[in-house]
Structure formats: C-alpha cells, structure tokens
Amino acid sequence: MKVVEISHPMVKHKLGLMRAASISTQEFRRLTKEITSLLTYEVTAGFELEKTEILGWQGENIEIDQIKGKKLTVVPILRAGLGMMDGVFEHVPAAKVSMVGMYRDEKTAKPVAYFAKLCDKLDERVALIVDPMLATGGSMIATVSLLKKAGSKDIKIITLVSAPEGIDALAKAHPDVELYTASIDSHLNDKKYIIPGLGDAGDKIFGTK
C-alpha cells in the first residue's frame, strides 16, 4: 500500500497547533480545512493531464492542460469527515459527494455501516475518503470494502493523523489503496486513542462532548 506522510512545514505547523488542549472549536475547524486543502493538493499531484482546445480571450483557438479522465467523489466518513470536505472543495469544487456512516457493533466489535449514500458511476471515479484519524483502521477498512463492492476501483484516503497499527491493518486488508496523512503518530494507547493524536476530532469540529 502506498503511504505518504506529508512533510511540508506548513502542514506540520498547523497540525502542531491542533494538538493543543486549549484549542477552540473555531480554530480546530479552520485548521482541519486548511490541512485537508494542502493534503488534497498532494493527492492530486499525480493526476494525468491531457491537452484540450478552447476559444481563447483573443478570439483564437488555443491548447490548454486539463486533468485527464476520471472525475472525483469525496467520501466523508460521518461525522468527523464532514469537517474535511471544504478543504477538498477548494481544489475540486465540482466533486460529487458520497457519504458513509459507521457504528461499532458492541457484540462483535466490528464496524457496521448504518448509512451509505453513494454517487453514480463509482467505477469511473477516483474515490477520496476523508476522515481526520486512522486509529485501529476498522471503520476505514469497512468503508473501502463498501466502496469496492459498489464498483469503486481507484481509492485514495486523506487523514490528519494515523497510527501505525491502523496503517498495518489497512495495508493487509486493502494493499491497493493510497493513504495520504499529515502525520504518522507514535501508537494507540490501551483505549485505542492515537498518541499523541488530536483527541476526539468529531467533538472538536462540532463543539460537542
């Protein structure tokens, strides 16, 4: 599995601010959007270009570069993933949205989809899953499986922080996806929280506890 940890100084600086215990909802939300925007820029750097002809401002036909082939659907994992969508839209404002919601079954401890609203022609699109954190990997693995079952063949993932345990689990389950993250953190604690992590990203984005 392709794993890219973005080392850009602006990404690291902004992520560092997000780790503060005193951060406000407004600031956390803003930084989530800004980092997601920077990560989206990195994800799309590998997209192919093709020449196309348009009528230029001077009244003559000219050749311009345009992204080739596949369109994009952004896939936020509810609810925290919603806070990352605007960062993607800054670069791909026409992206379709496919939403997935997961909950943990208390008996099996496995993630179960409680909501899925996917756009059409997934097999013709790049699916960009967004979720602030990759911890154990359970929800992410289940989301990728759901998308593949619906026809998706090209899946990329953006997270703000990722745990090595989650990366390993995802790589074993879906070695064909690509992961772009602002940080590979140290480990999961005994409660399965990422250390040093960000705390509960969903609560911090939406101002809940």
UniProtKB/Swiss-Prot annotation:
GO terms for molecular function: GTP binding; magnesium ion binding; uracil phosphoribosyltransferase activity. It catalyses: UMP + diphosphate = 5-phospho-alpha-D-ribose 1-diphosphate + uracil. 5-phospho-alpha-D-ribose 1-diphosphate binds at R79, R104, D131, P132, M133, L134, A135, T136, G137, G138, S139, D200. Uracil binds at I194, G199, D200, A201. Pathway: Pyrimidine metabolism; UMP biosynthesis via salvage pathway; UMP from uracil: step 1/1. SUPFAM superfamilies: PRTase-like. Signal peptide: none annotated. Its EC number is 2.4.2.9. Belongs to the UPRTase family. This is Uracil phosphoribosyltransferase.
